[in-house]
Amino acid sequence: MRTGEINRRTAETDITLRLELDGTGVGDIDSGVGFLDHMLTLFAKHGHFDLTLRCVGDNRVDDHHAVEDIGICLGQAFRSALGEKKGICRYGDITLPMDETLMLAAADISGRGGFFPDLRIPASKVGTFDTELGAEFWAAFARESGITLHLRQLAGDNSHHILEATFKAVGHALRKAVTVDWAFAQEVPSTKGTLS
């Protein structure tokens, strides 16, 4: 069972997160940020990950700390669940349509985390959610997971759809990348012999 569990408490947030890579797409999410709950539920569903999350944050200030810290914890859970990374396909990508939006996501479980976005989100808010926090979330996730993540918005002008497409697309790309190729189950997919 490839599982990562993270408990992280700071002066700004108290987070408990459990991730199962080989799940069924069940999300049990309470981040304290309604829009992020919706996005993470979609991420779990499209990645076929089981994700349980509880976060108590200083949302009276704003949602920034909760969103970024959840990205940190999800990244750490991915890194933990992947272990030595033996047998994984390593790479995953998708070009995902959502109505007028077209989103490309590509992931490399390289051990060298980095986030490389090309997103043009027209609105500063979707409901009460600051749209710039989407990039903050993915940057924290990529850094902590050791995953190189590219997101390219190929079309779209609806801010909700653009953000939603990022979470769905990353879920699909990561599902491919974490899949075990059983013919090479004892090999790390790198000529270096390690992905760290």
Q: What spans do the regions from the language model cover?
A:
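Structural preference for solvent-exposed beta-strand-turn elements
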Residues: 1-196
